[in-house]
Design a protein with these regions (language model features):
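N-terminal ligand-binding lobe of clamshell/alpha-beta domains
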Residues: 1-259
């Protein structure tokens, strides 16, 4: 099998000692019933809540303790193209087989979950999760079908001011919610933006991650634009694991509040 970057994955047996360097995918592994096989996580793997107390924390998503990972004797390491650096992937590949995910839309999400199910011998649960997400997405699309299109700017960082571009999973979910990203095609995935772009939006969404935007930042942006400023939970817009099972309820509530 190949991972989503086309790298060959060669496993001698079904993995029993997994290290995951992607917070959203750590949550996914647990929801697939694989918590007992999970031995190492990052400091940002905050879901489930007490997991970090039960597993070995091996660093962050951009900086790892390779010695800690090696000491765990993992037989499978899960990374992500966007969350982790190429250097981290190369270091981990010297320790155990590494699967690098690259999830930019629902099709790549479904493909990844099926891969995980096959590699980790939990395919029935993986297929059930995919089917549930597909059904929930279908229902959500029906509920927002009559929503007006709203121009939106989704901010992820403050200094410099940065937004989610169109080639992101965040943008896919914005579109599903009836939003149109004011970032132009061809820009980087997370371009720097200026105050002029703020003025083109009907709504400016302040994400709770990676920069921890909160209510205290709203007034500052209200002086720069007539757009409605709203704080949103970034996990529901950017976590592409089993968090999607809860995301559509969150989006429905958000759209109700906007209306």
């Amino acid at each position: 099998m190949q991972d989503q970057l086309g790298r060959e994955i060669n496993l001698k047996a079904t993995p029993q000692r997994i290290v995951c360097l992607v917070p959203s995918l750590t949550e996914l592994l647990v929801d697939l019933g694989l918590s007992d096989r999970l031995v190492g996580v990052t400091k940002f793997c905050v879901h489930p809540e007490n997991l970090r107390k039960q597993k070995t924390v091996v660093g962050g998503t951009k900086s790892i303790h390779a010695d800690r990972i090696a000491a765990l004797k993992p037989d499978f390491i899960l990374c992500n193209k966007e969350e982790n650096t190429q250097e981290i992937v190369e270091i981990c590949a010297q320790i155990a087989p590494v699967y690098v995910s690259d999830i930019n839309d629902f099709d790549s999400f479904y493909h990844f979950v099926n891969d995980l199910g096959a590699l980790l011998n939990c395919l029935p649960k993986a297929e059930t999760l995919n089917a549930t997400v597909k059904e929930r997405l279908f229902q959500f699309r029906i509920s927002v079908n009559s929503e007006p299109v709203r121009n939106v700017l989704y901010l992820i960082w403050k200094n410099p001011l940065m937004a989610a571009g169109k080639a992101t999973f965040i943008n896919v979910l914005l579109n599903e919610c009836g939003f149109k990203n004011v970032i132009k095609e061809g820009n980087s995935r997370y371009p720097e933006v200026d105050s002029e772009l703020l003025k083109k939006a009907d709504y400016v969404l302040l994400s709770s991650e990676p920069f921890p935007f909160s209510e205290k930042h709203i007034a500052e942006f209200e002086t720069q634009t007539k757009a409605k400023i709203i704080c949103v939970d970034g996990e529901y817009f950017s976590w592409y694991g089993s968090r999607l099972l809860k995301a559509f309820d969150y989006f429905e509530k958000l759209l109700t509040e906007i209306n």
